[in-house]
Amino acid sequence: MATPHINAEMGAFADVVLMPGDPLRAKYIAETFLEDVVQVCDVRNMFGYTGTYKGRKISVMGHGMGIPSCSIYATELIKDFGVKKIIRVGSCGAVNEDIKVRDVVIGMGACTDSKVNRIRFKGHDFAAIADYKMVRAAEDAAKARGIDVKVGNLFSAELFYTPDPEMFDVMDKYGIVGVEMEAAGIYGVAAEYGAKALTICTVSDHIKTGEQTTSDERQTTFNDMMLIALDSVLLGDAE
């Protein structure tokens, strides 16, 4: 049965969903990496697809920008469509000189300046963390392909155009591996509804140096991240 934001039928989604922010990246992932692909939803042009990867049923759907948007889609997928695992595959900015543009980072946790998890957790701080086995599977998948990844804390920002750029120095000091806008929200939703989640990001720009990729590159060239996510699903099944 369709929800207010996802016009799919029950059973349309696999138990694992890859979620990029950009719905056109969802389309790219489905058309590039999956077989027997069927588009299952398109409300607000937030496209969702289901297909198979090496015989394994997997879905992919966009989640938009920011914690409020991704939380809506993650909640409905888990609560209404029975999704068990969400893997966000997105872009992030780097603040550390040892992390370069196009590096892949795995978010084992996510700090945030958003209050959504405090609202969810009765005013207390909630440690927004990824599922350990999903983190391990992603790291193992990367090693199997010879892809170097950085594993650490992300920072999920409430604002893209921040009025406090000095915060980037604080993030660097605390070892933040990437700045994005969704992981903490997705981890909170997963915890609330008893699901599992992971965020894998490709560094699209470096906040300190100004180096950046184009919007077209962000949409269609971050293939290492996609392959790590897909392979990690198969490794998770094998446990």
UniProtKB/Swiss-Prot annotation:
GO CC field: cytosol
Residues annotated as binding phosphate: 21, 25, 44, 88-91
Binding site for a purine D-ribonucleoside: 5, 180-182, 204-205
InterPro entries in the record: DeoD-type (IPR004402), Nucleoside_phosphorylase_CS (IPR018016), Nucleoside_phosphorylase_d (IPR000845), Nucleoside_phosphorylase_sf (IPR035994)
EC number, as in UniProt: 2.4.2.1
Active-site positions on this chain: 205
Keywords: Glycosyltransferase, Transferase
GO biological process: purine nucleoside catabolic process
Class in the EC hierarchy, top level: transferase
Annotated Gene3D superfamilies: Nucleoside phosphorylase domain
Site (Important for catalytic activity) residue list: 218
Catalytic activity, as annotated: a purine D-ribonucleoside + phosphate = a purine nucleobase + alpha-D-ribose 1-phosphate; a purine 2'-deoxy-D-ribonucleoside + phosphate = a purine nucleobase + 2-deoxy-alpha-D-ribose 1-phosphate
One Gene Ontology term of the molecular function aspect: purine-nucleoside phosphorylase activity
Assembly mode: Homohexamer; trimer of homodimers.
Cross-referenced HAMAP family: Pur_nucleosid_phosp
Protein family per UniProt: Belongs to the PNP/UDP phosphorylase family.
Primary role: Catalyzes the reversible phosphorolytic breakdown of the N-glycosidic bond in the beta-(deoxy)ribonucleoside molecules, with the formation of the corresponding free purine bases and pentose-1-phosphate.
Name under which the protein is recorded: Purine nucleoside phosphorylase DeoD-type 1
High-level lineage: Bacteria, Pseudomonadati, Pseudomonadota, Gammaproteobacteria, Vibrionales
